[in-house]
């Protein structure tokens, strides 16, 4: 199903696109790259496809805005949901650190 809506100004189409409780995805088709960039920044959705639709990749984050969900799936950020990052600083020399508050 494809929904096509006529509009006269970019402000009008942004208002129409954002006038919903949901914001999972949007698709923009235009010959103007600058228009696509402006619209993709202004539309409140978790993913925006430009001159294509439903292209996915496991390294791209996926998730919505508003009532379409909180958080993201996939992508590098998802790895952090399953890990506990920890920083360990270790003196590898045989000498004790001269001042533990000075990083070398």
Language model features with spans:
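Conserved C-terminal structural/oligomerization subdomain of aldehyde/semialdehyde dehydrogenase
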Residues: 1-104
